Every structure is written in structure tokens, then in C-alpha cells.
């Protein structure tokens, strides 16, 4: 067994190698899972609900992220078909994973008759935490970097970051680090500040994720030099714009009623026994 044989490999057992990329992605996913599981227990959900969700969700998310990357790099992969499955070498586009995961989540929670918006609130902030870990996988693979910078740019950075960002004979801007930090700040903001002071209705934390990550990725993508392109445009920036728009509309309540798949009559009794038809009030509030 060889631990840390090089910057890309975490551990090797003979010909079997486990990449840092995989370890960091799974570490992020595990942290997100544990946080979600703790909250779901507080909400009274059976723990097996999340257990049944997370494994297929992780698989589908990675599959969607890889498919998105391969589609927009088809000029290369059409001649290297055997490399399509080589995700340990990098090449996962988060937007593809988000789209695939969103579709699966709609199906899963509707089938289980669980509020999608409530799960949206629960899961999406933790996705930012998982993404913060995942960007360090890009660091180990020397990808998701920006333009050429001078050596003095790294004066106040740790040596291991400076050394790893020396790519193709030049120092590169560590855009992976910028996004990782922004994702971590987004997780903390949504979880501890937004939820406490600005949360109005179910789904708001999920929609805030879309706004936060949309802005973060749009800005940082403009600094990168290895972006996926379509018709001369950066695909990540186009999708990020869509995320921002949908997120803002969601925070305004535009999609709220669409996710109440089956409205049930809701009534409240006042203390004096008066029956109050409060269905509209409850749906507008929660």
C-alpha cells in the first residue's frame, strides 16, 4: 500500500488506485448526508427515507455531471470513447449534476408523498458544503484554474497551493479556491443567517442556493481558462444566469403553488372553538 504516491492519488494498492478527486467528492457528500440526516430526525422523518434517497441521488448526480461534461467536450471524447467513464481523471460539470439531481428529487419525493419544497430547503444548502469539498478535488487534479499570474500573486498563499497551481510552465489563478470559499460562506449564510432572518416560505433556502451559486459561478467562471463552451459562450455562465432568474422568481413565490401537488383542506380551531377556514393562509405562509 502506498499512501499519497502523488498529488492525484490518495492511496494505491498495487494496480488499484483511489484518487483524491473521489475521496474529496465522497467526503463532501458524507458531510451533507450527516447534516441532512440530523435535521430529518428533528423533523420526525424516518431515517431510511434519506438512506433510500442518497445512494441513487449520488449516482445520478455524478452521471449527470459527467454526461454534461462529455457532451460539451464531444470533439475529444468522440475519438476517445474509452475515457468517457474515467471520472477519476476529473471532468464533472456541476450544472449537469444539479439538473439530473433535481429531476430525480422531484420524482423521489413525489412518490414518497413528501413535500419537495421542504426537502429543497433541507438539501440544497448542504450541497454548497459538498461543493466546497469537491473543488479541492479539482485542485488535486490541477483543473478549474484561471489565467496566468505572477509568482508574487502567491506571496500570502500556502506553499502547497502555490506549487500545485504551477501548471504548464506558469502559475495559474486558483479559481477553485475562490469558489470553494464562496460555497462555504454560502452554506453558512443560508443555514445560520438567511434561514433565521429572511426565510418566509418553504423552498426559500433552496431558491437562495440557486441565487447564491448562480452569482458565484457566473463571476468565477469569467476568470477561468478551461471553461466548457457552446457557440462561443461559456455554458456555466449561461446556466448560472438561468439559476439566478429561477432562484429570484422562487423567492418571490412564483413557483410555490406549483409544488403543492395535492392540496388538502386545512382548518384551525380558535381557542373559543370557532372553526376557521385557514387553507389559504397556511399555504401562503408555509
Regions found by a protein language model. Name each.
Residues 264-286:
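Active-site neighborhood of HAD-like aspartate-dependent phosphohydrolases
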Residues 1-263:
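A feature for loop-to-transmembrane-helix boundaries and adjacent hydrophobic helices
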Amino acid at each position: 500500500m502506498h499512501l499519497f504516491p502523488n498529488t492525484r492519488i490518495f492511496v494505491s494498492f498495487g494496480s488499484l488506485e483511489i484518487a483524491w478527486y473521489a475521496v474529496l467528492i465522497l467526503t463532501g457528500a458524507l458531510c451533507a448526508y450527516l447534516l441532512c440526516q440530523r435535521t430529518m430526525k428533528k423533523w420526525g422523518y424516518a431515517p431510511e427515507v434519506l438512506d433510500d434517497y442518497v445512494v441513487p441521488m449520488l449516482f445520478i448526480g455524478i452521471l449527470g455531471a459527467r454526461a454534461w461534461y462529455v457532451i460539451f467536450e464531444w470533439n475529444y471524447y468522440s475519438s476517445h470513447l474509452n475515457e468517457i467513464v474515467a471520472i477519476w481523471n476529473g471532468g464533472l460539470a456541476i450544472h449537469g449534476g444539479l439538473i439530473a439531481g433535481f429531476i430525480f428529487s422531484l420524482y423521489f419525493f413525489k412518490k414518497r408523498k413528501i413535500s419537495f419544497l421542504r426537502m429543497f430547503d433541507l438539501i440544497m444548502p448542504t450541497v454548497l458544503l459538498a461543493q466546497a469539498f469537491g473543488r479541492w478535488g479539482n485542485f488535486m487534479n490541477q483543473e478549474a484554474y484561471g489565467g496566468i499570474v505572477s509568482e508574487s500573486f502567491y506571496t500570502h498563499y500556502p506553499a502547497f497551493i502555490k506549487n500545485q497551481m504551477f501548471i504548464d510552465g506558469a502559475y495559474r489563478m486558483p479559481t477553485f479556491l475562490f469558489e470553494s470559499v464562496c460555497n462555504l460562506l454560502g452554506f453558512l449564510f443560508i443555514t445560520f443567517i438567511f434561514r433565521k432572518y429572511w426565510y418566509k416560505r418553504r423552498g426559500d433556502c433552496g431558491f437562495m442556493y440557486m441565487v447564491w451559486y448562480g452569482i458565484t459561478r457566473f463571476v468565477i467562471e469569467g476568470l477561468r481558462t478551461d471553461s466548457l463552451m457552446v457557440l462561443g459562450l461559456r455554458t456555466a455562465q449561461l446556466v448560472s444566469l438561468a439559476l439566478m432568474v429561477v432562484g429570484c422568481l422562487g423567492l418571490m413565490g412564483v413557483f410555490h403553488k406549483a409544488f403543492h401537488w395535492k392540496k388538502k383542506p386545512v382548518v384551525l380551531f380558535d381557542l373559543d372553538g370557532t372553526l376557521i377556514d385557514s387553507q389559504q393562509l397556511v399555504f401562503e405562509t408555509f
